[in-house]
Amino acid sequence: MIKKIGVLTSGGDAPGMNAAIRGVVRAALTEGLEVFGIYDGYLGLYEDRMVQLDRYSVSDMINRGGTFLGSARFPEFREEHIRAVAIENMKKRGLDALVVIGGDGSYMGAMRLTEMGFPCIGLPGTIDNDIKGTDYTIGFFTALSTVVEAIDRLRDTSSSHQRISVVEVMGRYCGDLTLAAAIAGGCEFIMVPEVEYTRDDLVAEIKAGIAKGKKHAIVAITEHMCDVDELASYIEKETGRETRATVLGHIQRGGSPVPYDRILASRMGAYAIELLLQGHGGRCVGIQNEKLVHHDIIDAIENMKRPFKNDWLDCAKKLY
């Protein structure tokens, strides 16, 4: 019988994490459970930095970016003796289960704790949208809004100077954020890690656009694919058009979450409590076709396939 739970955020922050914490806390309190917030992710769990939360602890949090509980990278959590200390800390507080909000690295920690006998539920919190078992992750749509706003501003100046702009978008090794931003921002060219593409392919497409009368262009590219400053220099050399690179960086992680992320985070947080009360552990929450679902965490980490959004890419190319 679950009476007390913990909640933490781990890994890179994402807009909507506070809304997810709020969803967990208020749904748990409605069911008569006690809730403890853990500061700075798994590091705080290991260092026994926890605080009991009530309804007012999460007041005015639904619209705030970041995570008020904090987050930290803690690779040492891979070690079993480190996790054993974390479990002992939770047991000292009387905790029966844990809700973890984060990406696939956070999921791995939750899975390991479950394997050691401490039930966990994972919620997908990352702007990269790279978690298997869910159509969208908490924070994706807010980051998308931020990227599109930046692209709109770059288009203003690119068109004024008949310039080519190369925009580096976050996503780690997933092109979803780049693809969505390219469609919404009307980008002329796209480079994502799921599609094999050379810089000469890109230059050929840009030259074809120039031959048709294109005066300026926006190139959206996912991070880690290449050095965007070098790419911009190469494009300028090969096309004769002034080209500049812009790395949006961590600004993409900040900002007040858009309504969809607030709703998604709230629903997922409340659903995590439902699952725990039903006796589930080692599960992760997702949304598929606008319905909440849950999967075994190990499947989300290792076994499930995450289909590439070819229809998004096809749409973007038709609109070049």
From Swiss-Prot:
Reaction(s) the record says it catalyses: beta-D-fructose 6-phosphate + ATP = beta-D-fructose 1,6-bisphosphate + ADP + H(+)
InterPro entries in alphabetical order: ATP_PFK, ATP_PFK_prok-type, PFKA_ATP_prok, Phosphofructokinase_CS, Phosphofructokinase_dom, PKF_sf
UniProt GO MF annotations: 6-phosphofructokinase activity; AMP binding; ATP binding; fructose-6-phosphate binding; identical protein binding; metal ion binding; monosaccharide binding
Location (main, coarse): cytoplasm
Positions annotated to bind substrate: T126, I127, D128, R163, M170, G171, R172, E223, R244, H250, I251, Q252, R253
Pfam families, per database record: PFK
Cellular component annotations (GO), alphabetically ordered: 6-phosphofructokinase complex
Location(s) in or outside the cell: Cytoplasm
Activity control summary: Allosterically activated by ADP and other diphosphonucleosides, and allosterically inhibited by phosphoenolpyruvate.
Active site per database record: D128 (proton acceptor)
Pathway the protein acts in: Carbohydrate degradation; glycolysis; D-glyceraldehyde 3-phosphate and glycerone phosphate from D-glucose: step 3/4
GO biological process: canonical glycolysis; fructose 1,6-bisphosphate metabolic process; fructose 6-phosphate metabolic process
Entry keyword set: Allosteric enzyme, ATP-binding, Cytoplasm, Glycolysis, Kinase, Magnesium, Metal-binding, Nucleotide-binding, Transferase
Cofactor names: Mg(2+)
Positions contributing to ADP binding: 22-26, 55-60, 155, 186-188, 212, 214-216
Residues given in the record as Mg(2+) binding sites: D104
Enzyme Commission identifier(s): 2.7.1.11
Assembly and oligomerization: Homotetramer.
Physiological role: Catalyzes the phosphorylation of D-fructose 6-phosphate to fructose 1,6-bisphosphate by ATP, the first committing step of glycolysis.
Family label: Belongs to the phosphofructokinase type A (PFKA) family. ATP-dependent PFK group I subfamily. Prokaryotic clade 'B1' sub-subfamily.
Name of the protein described by the UniProt record: ATP-dependent 6-phosphofructokinase
Annotated source species: Klebsiella pneumoniae subsp. pneumoniae (strain ATCC 700721 / MGH 78578)
